[in-house]
């Protein structure tokens, strides 16, 4: 499990820029699942990310001009998988995949699992999602040296990880292209890009909601160009702007924070919402999850094999 936090001071700065005052939230909020053990959980007081800026013509910062190289086009015969609401799933990011869960969808680590692992799941009739961190540098990944120092920000609270400067599209795009190539070449059906709401955290960079929208749309286009479907991880405030670009959603703890209704645009569009709770008992949220048609379960924070579905 990954914890995403936004300090009260950082939020006040963002709100002041918008002519607002106040700071909400008083308990630490868990965030993206990762499958590694943090050196220490973040201690900053959480709050909601700043409200997304309205859509409109976007220009890249002067230090990071938009890429001019077009994305590769998928094969005309490639059909992007469109998971429907209500599908059961397994989310295992801790180690090599265990295939014992009898569910149609598996979400597993793209680096730690092989093409043979994916093929074994396919033979059992499963669809397989490739977990990839696109918002933070990880010193334990084989491509760690591909990231220049200029894009590395503050530590994000997890051992060996630092936030990325997502404004530098021309630097990050080819790295993410290679990662998504890996997912495609291993036979994955989809991508789960992690940490796509850095703008709501103290990253060390002055990231805005508009920067995040630009980056997230680029990530979605890279996946689609490779015939992969792509899920929006958390980032609830930007769902209205991004639901058309993503094929499903992955959410952590919307029930605990009474936010699950914010995911309704995905369900209304016929797109699955894969949802997990870590501390809430099933009796406290499963009825509402069924009403909203979410694919919900309880998992332990380390995201191993154990699961308790609604």
Predicted regions and their residues:
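C-terminal active-site rim and adjoining tail of enzyme catalytic domains
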Residues: 4, 85-91, 250-259, 267, ...
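N-terminal carbohydrate-binding/catalytic regions of secreted carbohydrate-active enzymes
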Residues: 76-167
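N-terminal low-complexity, Pro/Thr-rich disordered segments
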Residues: 7-9, 21-81
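Surface-exposed amphipathic alpha-helices with a cationic face
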Residues: 117-126, 184, 216-225, 263-267
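Sec-dependent bacterial lipoprotein signal peptides
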Residues: 1-21
């Amino acid at each position: 499990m990954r914890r995403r936090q936004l300090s009260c001071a950082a939020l006040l700065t963002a709100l002041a820029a918008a002519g607002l005052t106040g700071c909400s939230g008083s308990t630490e909020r868990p965030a993206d699942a990762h499958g590694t053990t943090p050196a220490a959980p973040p201690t900053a007081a959480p709050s909601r990310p700043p409200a997304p800026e309205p859509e409109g013509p976007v220009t890249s910062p002067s230090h990071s001009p938009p890429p001019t190289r077009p994305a590769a086009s998928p094969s005309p015969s490639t059909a992007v998988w469109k998971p429907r609401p209500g599908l059961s799933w397994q989310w295992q990011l801790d180690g090599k995949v265990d295939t014992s869960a009898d569910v149609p969808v598996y979400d597993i680590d793209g680096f730690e699992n092989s093409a043979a692992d994916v093929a074994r799941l396919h033979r059992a009739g499963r669809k397989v999602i490739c977990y990839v961190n696109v918002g933070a540098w990880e010193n334990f990944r084989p491509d760690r040296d591909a990231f220049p120092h200029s894009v590395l920000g503050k530590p994000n609270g997890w051992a060996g990880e630092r936030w990325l400067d997502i404004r530098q599209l021309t630097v990050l795009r080819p790295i993410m292209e290679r990662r998504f190539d890996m997912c495609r070449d291993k036979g994955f059906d989809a991508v789960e890009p992690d940490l796509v709401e850095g703008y709501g955290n103290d990253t060390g960079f002055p990231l805005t909601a508009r920067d995040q929208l630009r980056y997230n749309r680029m990530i979605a286009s890279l996946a689609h160009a490779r015939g992969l479907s792509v899920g929006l991880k958390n980032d609830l405030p930007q769902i209205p702007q991004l639901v058309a670009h993503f094929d499903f959603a992955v959410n952590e703890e919307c029930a605990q924070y009474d936010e699950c209704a914010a995911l309704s645009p995905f369900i209304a569009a016929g797109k699955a919402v894969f949802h997990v709770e870590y501390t809430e008992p099933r009796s406290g949220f499963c009825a509402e999850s069924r009403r909203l048609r979410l694919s919900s379960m309880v998992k332990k924070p380390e995201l191993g094999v154990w699961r308790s579905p609604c």
